[in-house]
């Protein structure tokens, strides 16, 4: 590519065409910036602006109040002993795996684990054993199955897994497994539990100590109204000196933590998380209403012939639907499998991936009952239009 003036016109400022649409994309609903975060995005957008008053350790910066945020506010919010900021939930998971386990050790993953959990384990050169889930339509994770997976690992390898992980909720069906029971089962074998909370921390109340988990990974850009990439990593020391292991320092660069490569998310990403934090804390207190909205929405779509997969009654805003009637329509209309995406787009609704009709997932988080009613009416109109 020749970087002449004509070629460079492809870049520069690019407007986002979906920014004013009603958003039901599970990846995006929890990451929409608050107004304070939008102001912070501009104020702290310069690359290393966070380092105006840095003494060499990101999480110890006092102006702005990064130290207070990371070492006081976030531990209280997450129910953990120590917190660090990372570049995302996947980086948090990898840091734990890489620090806790040795090459060739086994990590136990739930059968609904996100691909990034698998890749993180592979990057750490670990063996993976998955806990099976029940079949359609529930996709249930049995806590006792973690014990079975651990015992099978001990039988085959001669030692317990280095770590177990639970996705809470899973990113396909929005199921919330019994994390407290699973933690208890794992601890019977002295196996620590990592909770992947990419879709929960910042949306709903999550207290790691109450659940009995050792590590918690959260996503700022997915669920804490932050610009990405940014995540959180929380560590509890009730079952071991895990903070010393995870946050060990370099012997040569004595104030730099090895697993974090020194400093992680900074400037715009961190400052948008801090700016949104007051509203994020408050919105988790409204979780009961969010669940009520999700259940109401699911019930309405099911009256039209769609089928919600996963837990019922549902306990999360992320939902997966099977839509045989929409799929049937897609087999005979001119727009084919893109008809649903185009119909929703024409009604200012964004979030269901283009080309999906038979199965799709969506999120009702902070969409509001009025907009959800409009979306329900839109589905009704679309189905009747093609009957």
Swiss-Prot record:
The UniProt record lists the keyword Protein biosynthesis: yes
GO biological process, one term: translation
EC code: 2.5.1.73
Cofactor: pyridoxal 5'-phosphate
Binding site for pyridoxal 5'-phosphate: 89-90, 196, 219-221
GO function terms (MF aspect): Sep-tRNA:Cys-tRNA synthase activity
Catalyses which reaction(s): O-phospho-L-seryl-tRNA(Cys) + hydrogen sulfide + H(+) = L-cysteinyl-tRNA(Cys) + phosphate
InterPro entries in the record: PyrdxlP-dep_Trfase, PyrdxlP-dep_Trfase_major, PyrdxlP-dep_Trfase_small, Sep_Cys-tRNA_synth_arc, SepSecS/SepCysS
Residues with PTM N6-(pyridoxal phosphate)lysine: 222
Sorted UniProt keywords: Protein biosynthesis, Pyridoxal phosphate, Transferase
EC top class, as a word: transferase
Family note: Belongs to the SepCysS family.
Protein function: Converts O-phospho-L-seryl-tRNA(Cys) (Sep-tRNA(Cys)) to L-cysteinyl-tRNA(Cys) (Cys-tRNA(Cys)).
Subunit structure comment from the entry: Homodimer. Interacts with SepRS.
Annotated protein name in UniProt: O-phospho-L-seryl-tRNA:Cys-tRNA synthase 2
Species: Methanococcoides burtonii (strain DSM 6242 / NBRC 107633 / OCM 468 / ACE-M)
């Amino acid at each position: 590519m020749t970087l002449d003036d004509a070629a460079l016109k492809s870049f520069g400022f690019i407007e986002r065409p979906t920014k004013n649409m009603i958003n039901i994309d599970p990846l995006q609903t929890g990451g929409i910036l608050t107004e304070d975060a939008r102001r912070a995005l501009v104020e702290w957008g310069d690359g290393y602006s966070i380092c105006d008053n840095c003494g060499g350790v990101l999480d110890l910066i006092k102006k702005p109040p990064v130290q207070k945020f990371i070492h006081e506010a976030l531990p209280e919010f997450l129910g953990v002993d120590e917190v660090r900021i990372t570049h995302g939930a996947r980086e948090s998971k990898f840091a734990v795996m890489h620090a806790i386990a040795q090459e060739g050790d086994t990590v136990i993953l739930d059968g609904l684990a996100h691909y990034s959990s698998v890749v993180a384990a592979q990057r750490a050169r670990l063996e993976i054993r998955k806990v099976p889930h029940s079949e359609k339509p529930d996709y249930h994770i049995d806590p006792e199955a973690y014990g079975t997976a651990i015992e099978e690992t001990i039988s085959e390898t001669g030692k317990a897994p280095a770590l177990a992980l639970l996705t809470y909720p899973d990113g396909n069906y929005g199921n919330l497994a019994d994390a407290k029971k699973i933690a208890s089962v794992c601890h019977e074998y002295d196996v620590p539990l990592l909770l992947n909370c990419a879709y929960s921390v910042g949306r709903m109340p999550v207290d790691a100590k109450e659940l009995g988990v050792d590590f918690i990974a959260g996503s700022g850009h997915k669920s804490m109204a932050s610009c990405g990439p940014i995540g959180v990593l929380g560590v509890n020391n009730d079952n071991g000196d895990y903070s010393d292991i995870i946050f060990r320092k370099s012997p040569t660069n004595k104030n730099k933590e090895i697993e974090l490569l020194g400093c992680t998310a900074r400037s715009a990403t961190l400052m948008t998380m801090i700016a949104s934090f007051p509203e994020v804390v408050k919105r988790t207190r409204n979780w009961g209403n969010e669940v009520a909205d999700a259940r109401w929405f699911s019930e309405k779509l099911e009256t039209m012939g769609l089928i919600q997969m996963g837990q019922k009654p549902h306990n999360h805003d992320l939902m997966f639907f099977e839509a045989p009637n929409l799929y049937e329509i897609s087999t005979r209309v001119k727009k084919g499998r893109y008809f649903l995406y185009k119909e929703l787009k024409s009604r200012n609704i964004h979030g269901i991936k283009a080309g999906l009709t038979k199965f799709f997932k969506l999120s009702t988080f902070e969409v509001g009952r009025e907009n959800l009613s409009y979306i329900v009416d839109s589905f009704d109109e679309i189905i009747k239009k093609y009957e």
